[in-house]
Amino acid sequence: MTLQIIAGKSGTGKTTHLMDEVGKKIKKTSKTYIFIVPDQMTFQMETSFLNKESLSGMLGTQIFSFSRLAWKILQETGGLSKTFLSQTGIEMVIRKAALDQKDKLKIFSKATSRKGFYSELAKLFKEMKQEEVSVADLENSAINMSKSVTNKIHDISLIYQKYEELLAGKFLENEDYLRLLADKIIESDYLNQTEIIIDGFTSFSKQELTVIEKLMEKCDKVTVSLTLNVPEIQKGLEEYNMFKQSTEAYFALLEMAKLNKISVESDKLFLENKRAKSDSLAFLADVWGNNKFVTFEEKPQDLAIHQANNRRAEIEGIAREIRQLTLKGYRYQDMAILTRNISDYDVLCETVMESFDIPIFIDKKRAMAKHPFIEFIRSSIDAILFNWKYEPIFQAVKTEFFFDVSENTSIMRRKADILENYVLENGIQNKWKWEKEGDWIYRKIRGLSTNLLPQTDEELETQAIINEMRNLIVEPLSILENNLAKARTGTEFAMALYHFLEQVKAVEHLESWRQTAEENGYLELAREHEQAWSSVSELLDEFVEVLGEESLDINSFAEIVATGLDALEFSLLPPSLDQIVLSDMENAKLLDMKVIFAIGMNDGIMPLRQKDKGILSDQDRDSLRAENSNLKPSAKNNIGEEDLLAYKIISLPSDKLFLSYPAADEEGKVLSESNYLRKIKGQFKKLNEEVYLTDPSLLSDEEQSSYIRSKQATLGLLTSQLQMYKRGYPLSNVWWDAYNGYFEDTKESKVAKQVLSSLYYENKTKALHETTAKNLFGENIHASVSRMEKFFSCEFQHFAQYGLKLEERAHFKLQAVDMGEIFHGAMEWISAELKRNNQDWGNLTEEECRQMAKLAMTFLAPKIQHEILLSSKRMEYIQYKLLQIITRATTVLNEQAKSSAFRPIGLEVDFGLKGDIPSLKIPLKSESELLLQGRIDRIDVAEQDDRTFLRIIDYKSSSHDLALTEVYYGLALQMLTYLDIVVTNAQKMIGKTAEPAGVLYFHMHNQFVQADKELSDEAIAKELQKSSKMKGLILSDPVAVSLMDTSLEKGKSSNIIPAEIKQNGDLSARSRTATKEEFDKMRHFVRHKYQEAGNKILDGAVSINPYKLKERTPCQFCGFRSFCGFDPSLTSNQYRHLTNEKAENILTKMDIEGGTQ
């Protein structure tokens, strides 16, 4: 029984020596030689053995990790009768333990619902087993500590004890195998006449040291290779020395040998760096960690430091380096990319390397959490827990497991979208609505009178789809909910979930996806679908094994399963023979590398600026270790480990080392370089930091040529270079050669033309062909006034809404249009009620106004947008506020009616099609017509002597006024159009001709009075009346004005209309008035605008031409902006700037353009 230690720094040939020695011995003896290496190194070590002639094919050598050796020995000696628990199973059991003890926890009771808490607990429990730290050890160490630490240890102890209780006698973890291995080594025949060689470790856990001790006692010889700075081995025990852990292992092994009377052979010491082929790399590896500052005087040829603007520029720079190295004879397998934070670079590396046609293997297990199958399980359970809310239901639906597996997927997706739109619009947010008896009713157009109309065939067809999809969801989900409600034990809960997955035919779905992926060449995706099912099956099996007999409720089950699902990962296939590897620095599985790219070498990353994370903080660990706990040291005391990690990277390549860092992250936040890079630049005086440029134009032609990669990927860069050329910058011949190369290949030429056309891109539309325009809009255009206003706002917006008929998705929320409908509906209902009872607006009392408003709201509330006003307490409050506004409006209209001779003769009057008044017909080119249709809020009439006046009143939920500038540009045509229609059709409506009295906006709102002193009730009433004054434009005729406000006196302003009478009886300049002639000109001009718009629509006008009036643009609330892509920074995309002018100037222009002059 012998111990020998092989010691030396990295790259001095320790592993090679061990392999050579075994190669010599094995030919002369029947002994077995067992190599023990870290878990992640077994595959690479086996490959090295196969490649070494002296060992290839030798049956007397075996390579194990500690865990694999444990499996081998326990198979031989017994001890594998207990079930092995995976990491997923461990975390589920820990969660069950924590939930059972939740009421007793002092610190962690809230943390039990925090994501990541159980994986951190699992790490701590693993460390406790590895370092042989018991709960009693922790409790004893914490006796004299602060309350927060003792409470934390109390909670850890409770959870750990319950966890051990759940596992007791039935299950094993990885760490248990090492404990059992130590006990069984002595019984093993397999270990007779063996030599053990332990290589690749920088430190050993307590468990591993115990196993090594037992191997020393059993085997002929144990050889341990350690990375040490041999000449200064005693210094290795200093606090921040990078070889501290190796040195501690060295002395621990010697101490064990001494205690067990094991003979110790002389150490074999290796001093010369045999790996590094260049002086610069050998020098750097030699002086790293040395406190003496030594410099390298020559310019290093095989060491480079690069800065990049960002991570993408960094990876693209490295990809160019790789391409150059392959031209010099290097293979991809000779190179590796190492990073501290692989999550910052994995997707980016995959994308960039693919664009350079560089095969890459990313050495990182991906979480399964985002796989549709995992998401489906999680969302389905959440849907039940949260009473069938929209979000979890449709997260589950979008995974497609509710779909009929035999149906066409595209058709099912379209049906699911229809269902989702219905659910969103109708506010279906609970189980009761989903399971409510009877079919859901679908109507495309919503409104107060919708329910009175029969359903169309299109509506019935959509309704059938909605109910078909609804049933596909409700049936399996209801059964799952019922089964979960009946379940009491872990087994019953697992069976409920399993039956649910069977019912939705989850296996068939996954198999179909796997086959499709395989047929299309996506082999990795096919394997993922396969793994998803097998992993979930194993998770449920493990759940039943561990917690099958445990009593659970649905919340505990959901939490434990969620923990298990979070822990699932896709397994990695080993890299192919010639790929470049991207790996995490700490877990890299690399041997015999020629070139290393160490990326992301930023401050705080290398060395890592540790933040307290995990269950125990740095302070906790330091305090516990001070009380003789064997826990690992805190992060802040791991500076030596950071230096050692950097040393491993530095000493890994034999030929070249590239170090790089980004100067900013994706959000532009500045990132500084690592202290290690500053140190290296200080040691290599002639090492110049270079930059990985994103724009190659400043480089030489030879350097620019390295930016040419695959044809597909080079196109983007070529386009940007040609864009610079267009602006007058010089262009290297490299890019002209690349350009010409695309057009030598017909296939590439087609793609290139499409991409390069962006150089001349203008975000402009082409006018539609006349036939297309007529197909879209009709030979005769039936349109509303608001549609024409939209056309004048932006032709493309009109095209999107009325030509393509695009719509924004409807949501179950109260919108401005709904409030407008309520206000209009209330006024219509009250007016109809007054007419039915032969009452007049002006004769109502204040109490009657309140009652009328209340009755109107009671009638309307259930009819507004799927009963939204009755859907919640919040909506009940909004209904109350709307009632206040309607009550106030009713009161104001009552007061105004008392002082006005005008009376309503029509409310919500339809014109056009089936309306009471015919359409306003506008003749267009080619014998076409524009037929206007719509609804007028209110038409008032007044008579005096032989004169009859008509006016229009429009109810608005926000403040409005009639701006003639907006009329002129076609943005506000509504009121004058309505006035034109009623005056034109006066004979039909009232049996006589009439004059236009004006157009007025009535603002429906709850007014407030602001005052700096206390006011009487009468003064408040007057102020409220002033704030209710209608805005608009009225006829400049004293008779008409006096009829609109019979209380108006000379020298006063009206509280009802925008009029003021001077002392001489004339209207003041502050009045908003127009003569009859001016009204006629405006009416004529408005018809001219409709004719202009109609002809342009038939001509196919679809320009992206939004206006800008002061700061107002139609883009502000446009739902099609992402579709049109309007960008004011493009010369082809500019606003139509409109200017305000004086009313008299506008009227003159209207007169000229309307053709009345």
Swiss-Prot record:
[4Fe-4S] cluster binds at C794, C1115, C1118, C1124. Gene3D superfamilies: 3.90.320.10, 6.10.140.1030, P-loop containing nucleotide triphosphate hydrolases (3.40.50.300). Binds 1 [4Fe-4S] cluster. Its cofactor is Mg(2+); [4Fe-4S] cluster. It is an enzyme of class 3 (hydrolase). It holds the Pfam family ADDB_N. Keywords: 4Fe-4S, ATP-binding, DNA damage, DNA repair, DNA-binding, Exonuclease, Helicase, Hydrolase, Iron, Iron-sulfur, Metal-binding, Nuclease, Nucleotide-binding. Residues 272-578 form the UvrD-like helicase C-terminal domain. Its EC number is 3.1.-.-. ATP binds at G8, K9, S10, G11, T12, G13, K14, T15. GO terms for biological process: double-strand break repair via homologous recombination. The keyword DNA repair applies. Residues 1-277 form the UvrD-like helicase ATP-binding domain. InterPro entries: ADDB_N, DNA_helicase_suAddB, DNA_helicase_UvrD-like_C, P-loop_NTPase, PDDEXK-like_dom_sf, PDDEXK_AddAB-type. GO terms for molecular function: 4 iron, 4 sulfur cluster binding; 5'-3' exonuclease activity; ATP binding; double-stranded DNA binding; helicase activity; metal ion binding. Belongs to the helicase family. AddB/RexB type 1 subfamily. Despite having conserved helicase domains, this subunit does not have helicase activity. Heterodimer of AddA and AddB. The heterodimer acts as both an ATP-dependent DNA helicase and an ATP-dependent, dual-direction single-stranded exonuclease. Recognizes the chi site generating a DNA molecule suitable for the initiation of homologous recombination. The AddB subunit has 5' -> 3' nuclease activity but not helicase activity. This is ATP-dependent helicase/deoxyribonuclease subunit B. It comes from Listeria welshimeri serovar 6b (strain ATCC 35897 / DSM 20650 / CCUG 15529 / CIP 8149 / NCTC 11857 / SLCC 5334 / V8). The lineage of its organism: Bacteria, Bacillati, Bacillota, Bacilli, Bacillales.
